[in-house]
Amino acid sequence: RDAQESRGLGDVYKRQALMVVQNPKNGDILAIAGKQIDKQGKLKDYDIGNFTAQYTVGSSVKGGTLLAGYQNKAINVGETMVDEPLKFQGGLTKRSYFNKNGHVSIDDKQALMHSSNVYMFKTALKLAGDPYTSGMSLPNNIADAGRKLRKGLNQVGLGLKTGIDLPNETPGQIEPLTNNPGNYLDLAIGQYDTYTPLQLSQYVSTIANDGYRIQPHIGLSIYESTNKDETGPLKRKIKGNVLNKVNNSSDEIKEVQEGFKMAF
């Protein structure tokens, strides 16, 4: 919440509501809707915001962070870490909301269930080749680790256009990390890059679809035109194209699926 307010997003979240319902198996968009309250206090349609507006989506990305960690052998399925306040050189402390002062041993699924910031920070530090130790300085060179983390997030649809059959889709806002380790850690918990609601839907759908990222589509069929007020012959059925398969094993994907289920 503090990070959202600091970036001027707090009021936006109070004035807008957006929703996407998608079939993860074939990319069919079953429903897409949005509303926003304008400056005059009037409720307006904002369906287009689902693929033209972007937000920091917070802890929702943590499943993608784990997948990136698995891909790069930074962590293993079922790995246990201690959730604890992380104390860095210079007095910086970073912690989880569910466990602000204690020391709790959790595995990867439990990290998703509890929305552990610390598990994700420790994963990101391992990905950077600099595992956490109390009092350590933040890693100086995080450019390569940032690319690896973003590549993992891209594979599930975060930070890329979804390919929906509508114009003016935005890929989100992906700022240079410029070797800022604080921004790199924030990226691991969804507090740096911004994504569209449709990207978030594709991300969850990719995990639900066992790692296959499907191109979403509004249209279902194309028919030949006729001179009569009737539907012409079917020309083509629109099917969701497989855009990519995430570079993870079935066990790794299932681990994230189970962690998501434990969160609800």
Regions from the PLM with identified roles:
Residues 11-53, 67-264:
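Beta-lactam-recognizing serine transpeptidase/beta-lactamase-like catalytic domain environment
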